[in-house]
Amino acid sequence: MNEYNNDNMEQEKEKKKEEQKYKNIIKKEYFIFPRLYDKNKEIEYNKLRIHNIKEYICIHLTISLFIILIECFVFSFNLNIKDTTYVEICVVIFSILNCLMHIVVLIKMYFFTSESVYTKGVFIGYIVLNQVFQFLSLYFFTKRNEQSKNDIAHLKYYDNSFNLYVHFFVDSVFILCLPALSFFLSVLFMMMFLCLNILLINMIKFNKTNYGSDIYHICLLSVVLLMFLILRYMMEERNRLLFFFIKDMMFDNYKKWYSDYIGAHYDKDKDSTTINGDNNKYEKEKCEDYKFLFSNKCILFHDFTLNACYKDYYSMICFLNKLLKSCNIKEDMSSNTSVNINGDTYQNMNFHDNINSNIPKNYNSFYEELKKNLNESDILTIAYEVEVLKNIKKINCDEIGKNWDYSFIDSEYGKSTLVILEVGYHLISPYIENNENKKKKLQLFLLLINSMYFPNPYHNANHGATVCHLSKCLAHITDYDSYLNNTYMICYLIASIAHDVGHPGKTNSYLSETNHILSIRYNDMSILENYHCSITFSILQLIGFDFLINNEDTKLVEKNNYTNMRKFIIELIISTDMKLHFEYVDIFKKRKKSQNFDISDTDAINLGTINIKLADIGHTCLKWKDHAKWTMLVSEEFFSQKRVEELHKNKNIDPLNFSNFGKEDNIDEGMIFNYENIYINYINNINNINTYDYSYIKLNFIHHHDFVKSIPSTQVYFFEIIVMPLIKELQSMEKSKKEITQKVLHNLNINLQTWRLIEKNINLFYNTEKMTGTDYYKNLEKQKLLRGIRLLDIAEEDVISLTKNFKEEIKHGKL
């Protein structure tokens, strides 16, 4: 018996240790009304929320001050100097004190920092004093009127009832919207405010019996405002946890839910509650080895990620559930499968029979058992094996990664929804050692990268694959691939294919100007480039980075470690920040002139950055048809950003207001890295939903002639100042075939000449199928001013002849 008790005590101790270990997010006493476990993080969270409504607070104070000034004027309007009573003096004094308090608080809010003013005490003090002053002013003013039997004839639209309703509404909305107050405190203030106003009505109308309608109306207004409070509370990102409880209560058996969730896991003696992703319940963790997906990013409060604390864990559960279900229902699942459970291998577990069984109970028990013994990588691997392998197209094209002039944007590979996976595997797999597990990890990595490229007009998966293709071409042209071992070639190609992963379709300057959450996280320094690196290494951390290392390498083996490879990849991705363009070009120029310039060692990273930089803007050096299409796409993306910027200016949207984050015409929340978004894009890819094919993209900028007119001059400037010097630095690195001179630089010169021609005659730009719906095109067609040749069909000889004809027309005064 003693041994049994000792065992129980040891188990209890272990449980307490585990509870202490996994104690993190939600305090049990705030299970329905979530609070961060760490008090300091809760304070930071509230500061940021209040900071976001700074303007709202100032607007409220201004409106309230305006109302009180009107009241003060009314109170002093009937002030009779000859027979002034103490009541009249009190009315004016209380009104003036209220005005002064509003002015002081308004100045404090507007001019002082959040740390010194955005405290709960300030707001509670303001609310209490405002109500005291207001109560006394109205009471004494009404009492004075009753005593003198003098209605306010001079201001007939002003009466006591109207004043009550205005104050009640304005001050109640302020209380209900103020995030510094907790839910219960807001409700408490609201109820106290209601009682105070009912008392005031009774005191004001003490000699009248028919004031029930006023009480009824003010109570009805209170109900509406309380509904608004609940709605505001539920709409706050971190409080959406309650939605998931309601969902579980509605769709699951209530008694089972109550006994499992409340009876078993909502014990008063427990300090905190955590989320168990394995069994989709909110309970204590039992598995010591269990780990959350990116717990340091998604679960814990980190870098002011407002939507991460109380939302992503459930998104993660949904993602894992959907993946498992989508995997298990496949008919092609092997009927003879082994599953490792608690270290033991069980053979002949028939997935098909269990999943397609007509008895849901059997399926659920097997499903739960399966989930308990699979970690995140296993689940993703199962999904990958079941879904993706059947959809991968093996690339049988020797031109990808070798021929600079290959028309990738129009190829069948460029239009594939799995373009990153297919092209990346085609280019990287030759450098992977002959190991099936490593090749599988490579495919899984590319799948997740593919799923985090979003359907922007320009910065999409097609762009990522194109840059990888061009980077491989440049590695061959500059003989870079002969200096690197297989491990670093893998890193080089991974950096190129993931260099824009997660791109939201907005520039760094936009993120910085709008104080976007990413600009705060990365301190306005290479914001997106740092974000791309973060996503890349987060995925590598999940699935393991061992597939990067080729153990068959015979050179630079001592440098084949994760730290060096990580530094190499980060440097390559950061170099694509155009703000750092001249800095990287100058570094390469100086190193190239140095006597100890050595690509095989210290300068490998310098040449790599120049290669990937040129590949990133490499569409400028493609054939005109491909380059013109990419220009259309990048112009559309810039135009979309311009529209959003104008929207912010027109609406006077506070750049510090993060509440606009995730709305239409802003950066979509779905473009922030989490596993729910990976799953959504994953399903779109599996279902072959391609939203970034050039032929399907709608171009909105074509209807704005001023924007269209600016494109040629912008391109000419970009070619001359940015691209041309970059290519000339690489010319000295090309091999005997002179491909940079004969292909890259040649294409650039032709494209530059074409843009100069279009700059002088913008009508050429409109002669394309995409432009046929514009008013400008119709006008040109009506006046017969369109040239015979289409924009995308312009060839080298056409540029020469058109330039010659254009000069002759200018000479003869026809233009």
Curated annotation (Swiss-Prot):
Q: How does it sit in the membrane?
A: Multi-pass membrane protein
Extracellular topological domain:
78-86, 142-160, 205-210
* Glycosylation site residues: 207
The UniProt keywords, alphabetically, are: cGMP, Glycoprotein, Hydrolase, Membrane, Metal-binding, Transmembrane, Transmembrane helix
Q: How is the cofactor bound?
A: Binds 2 divalent metal cations per subunit. Site 1 may preferentially bind zinc ions, while site 2 has a preference for magnesium and/or manganese ions.
Q: Does the keyword Hydrolase apply?
A: yes
For the ligand (a divalent metal cation 1), the binding residues are 463, 499-500, 616
Per the record, what ranges lie on the membrane's Cytoplasmic side?
A: 1-56, 108-120, 182-183, 232-815
Task: Cite the PDEase domain residue spans from the record.
Answer: 384-762
The transmembrane residues are 57-77, 87-107, 121-141, 161-181, 184-204, 211-231
Cell compartment(s), UniProt: Membrane
Quote the PROSITE patterns the UniProt record gives: PDEASE_I_1, PDEASE_I_2
Q: Which GO terms describe its cellular component?
A: membrane
State if Glycoprotein is listed as a keyword: yes
Q: What class of enzyme is it?
A: hydrolase
Q: What is the reported phenotype of gene knockout?
A: Impaired gametogenesis. Gametocytes are morphologically normal up to and including stage V of development; however, gametocytes fail to round up upon stimulation of gametogenesis with xanthurenic acid and levels of exflagellation are severely reduced. Higher levels of intracellular cGMP in stages III to V gametocytes.
Q: Which residues bind a divalent metal cation 2?
A: 500
Q: Which Enzyme Commission numbers does its entry carry?
A: 3.1.4.35
Q: In which pathway does it act?
A: Purine metabolism; 3',5'-cyclic GMP degradation; GMP from 3',5'-cyclic GMP: step 1/1
Say what the protein does. Specifically hydrolyzes the second messenger cGMP, which is a key regulator of many important physiological processes. Probably by regulating cGMP levels, required for activation of gametogenesis.
- This protein is called what? cGMP-specific 3',5'-cyclic phosphodiesterase delta
